[in-house]
Curated annotation (Swiss-Prot):
GO biological process: translation
HAMAP family noted in UniProt: Ribosomal_uS7_B (MF_00480_B)
Job description of the protein: One of the primary rRNA binding proteins, it binds directly to 16S rRNA where it nucleates assembly of the head domain of the 30S subunit. Is located at the subunit interface close to the decoding center, probably blocks exit of the E-site tRNA.
A Pfam match: Ribosomal_S7
MF GO annotations: rRNA binding; structural constituent of ribosome; tRNA binding
Sequence similarity: Belongs to the universal ribosomal protein uS7 family.
Organism: Streptococcus pneumoniae serotype 4 (strain ATCC BAA-334 / TIGR4)
Domain of life per record: Bacteria
Protein name: Small ribosomal subunit protein uS7
Lineage: Bacteria, Bacillati, Bacillota, Bacilli, Lactobacillales
Quaternary structure note: Part of the 30S ribosomal subunit. Contacts proteins S9 and S11.
UniProt xrefs under CDD domains: uS7_Bacteria (cd14869)
């Protein structure tokens, strides 16, 4: 491991269409093999579908969905006296967003719809309505943290 200082966090530029850093991060997460244009068209197309389906602003629906996906607690493994405990800890704000986007895109890729644009749009709509696999993933994470609440005093 490097002995030098940790690399500074780089700011993400807001995307030109919605002027939102969150949308840029979603595009970066959807992007494969450096094809940003393709990723952007997928995300913007999904947002158009969301706008048609709901009649509301797609960015607001997306932000609601992200709030429903982002975890507040998670468990981390901690070794104490020869055994590993799953210790519940609060999730830092930056990691909350990262996990939410990661879960959203991963689960959208696993859906059965024909195009990625459809999958992403449907998963965002499901998450905004507090249903769908991404919200279930968050609930499972919270359930794990609640089940291991007895080990909370091992926090560091």
């Amino acid at each position: 491991m490097s002995r030098k200082n940790r690399a500074p966090k780089r700011d993400v530029l807001p995307d030109p269409l919605y002027n939102s850093q969150l949308v840029t991060r979603l595009i970066n997460r959807v992007m494969l093999d450096g094809k940003r244009g393709t990723a952007a068209s997928i995300v913007y197309g999904a947002f158009e579908q969301i706008k048609e389906a709901t009649g509301n602003d797609a960015l607001e629906v997306f932000e609601t969905a992200m709030e429903n996906i982002m975890p507040v607690l998670e468990v981390r493994a901690r070794r104490v006296g020869g055994s590993n405990y799953q210790v519940p800890v609060k999730v830092r704000p930056e990691r909350r967003t990262t996990l939410g986007l990661r879960w959203l895109v991963t689960i959208a890729r696993l859906r059965g719809e024909h195009t990625m644009q459809d999958r992403l749009a449907k998963e965002i709509l499901d998450a905004a309505n507090n249903t769908g696999a991404a919200v279930k993933k968050r609930e499972d994470t919270h359930r794990m943290a609640e089940a291991n609440r007895a080990f909370a005093h091992f926090r560091w």
